[in-house]
Swiss-Prot record:
PANTHER family linked: 4-HYDROXYBENZOATE SOLANESYLTRANSFERASE, PROTOHEME IX FARNESYLTRANSFERASE, MITOCHONDRIAL
GO MF term (any one): protoheme IX farnesyltransferase activity
Reaction(s) the record says it catalyses: heme b + (2E,6E)-farnesyl diphosphate + H2O = Fe(II)-heme o + diphosphate
Function statement: Converts heme B (protoheme IX) to heme O by substitution of the vinyl group on carbon 2 of heme B porphyrin ring with a hydroxyethyl farnesyl side group.
Keyword NAD: no
Protein name (record): Protoheme IX farnesyltransferase
């Protein structure tokens, strides 16, 4: 496999390749949940400059983590149809370039958080970075089919980071937001792994549908979706949200549970794909409903 950057790659394509390394679609949801965490942490809308700087700092570190993930997994990515197009897998961008990009982005993000937000948010963001790039990507993902259950903690951190960026402290409310994403992550990724199981089998990664089968995985999707539905009601009990959120999350949970039950009863790859796509919509609308409910109160 080629590992040296291709000199003849046009500038526009190289810039696009660098952009894709940062996984902008995935990170857009990460930054969105962090922003909602900021909005929920303050009685009114957070100060615009602080909001923007904190969002940028968290985004830059997230981009750095994504780039290093692509570098570490370039050999695995090259074996999978879903990821073989990535620049690191194709050899269009060298490891040195990837490390340079990740270092610059990560350092800039941490500098912003340290200099203009607070040290707690900087350290928590750094811990999230290490959790994703080292604990999840290097250690857990190739070692256990429960990788996403344990490693999902890093992906659940953004709303907590947003909260501490505004308040400088950790409280029960952001921990609830953390719990929601933590429980959302396994059914989200397992649905993807189900309909991409042949890809993962080729990669050698011990994903749950490959190691334990579809039926076992779908049962776990249902269990985690049930726990997620319960956790999604906690914001109401804590007074973080009211009637609008309760109605919205009730409908969202019913649909998600419907997908999970359907997977257990009559699995198909098409249904797993729809479940995966809905899970993204679910989390987006859940956090949007939390924000909308706050606007109604204001």
């Amino acid at each position: 496999m080629q590992t040296i950057a291709t000199p003849s790659l046009p500038l526009g394509q190289r810039l696009a390749a660098f952009s894709h390394l940062c996984k902008p679609r995935v990170n857009s949801l990460i930054v969105f949940t962090a922003m909602i965490g900021m909005c929920l942490a303050t009685p009114d809308f957070p100060p615009l400059l602080r909001f923007g700087v904190a969002s940028l700092g968290i985004a830059l570190v997230s981009f750095a983590a994504a780039a290093l993930n692509c570098l570490v997994e370039r050999t695995v990515d090259a074996k999978m149809a879903r990821t073989s197009w990535r620049a690191t897998a194709r050899g269009d961008i060298s490891p040195l370039e990837t490390v340079t990009l990740a270092t610059a982005l990560g350092a800039a993000g941490l500098w912003l958080l340290h200099g203009f937000i607070n040290d707690l948010t900087m350290w928590l963001t750094l811990a999230t970075f290490v959790g994703y790039t080292v604990i999840y990507t290097l250690i857990l993902k190739p070692a256990t089919p429960m990788n996403i259950v344990i490693g999902g903690a890093s992906g659940a951190m953004p709303p907590l980071l947003g909260w501490t960026a505004m308040t400088g402290q950790v409280s029960a409310e952001p921990l609830v937001l953390f719990l929601i994403i933590f429980l959302w992550t396994p059914p989200h990724f397992w649905a993807l792994a189900c309909y991409r199981r042949d890809d993962y089998a080729c990669s050698g990664l011990p994903m749950l549908p490959v190691t334990h089968g579809i039926a076992f995985t779908c049962q776990h999707i249902l269990w985690y979706t049930l726990m997620l539905a319960a956790a999604s009601l906690i914001p109401v009990s804590l007074g973080m949200s009211g009637g609008f959120y309760l109605i919205a999350i009730g409908l969202l949970d019913l649909v998600f549970l419907g997908y999970a039950i359907a997977l257990c009863r009559r699995y198909s790859d098409a249904l797993a794909r729809r479940t995966f796509r809905y899970s993204i919509l679910y989390l987006t609308l859940l956090f949007a409903a939390l924000f909308a409910d706050r606007l109604i109160v204001l």
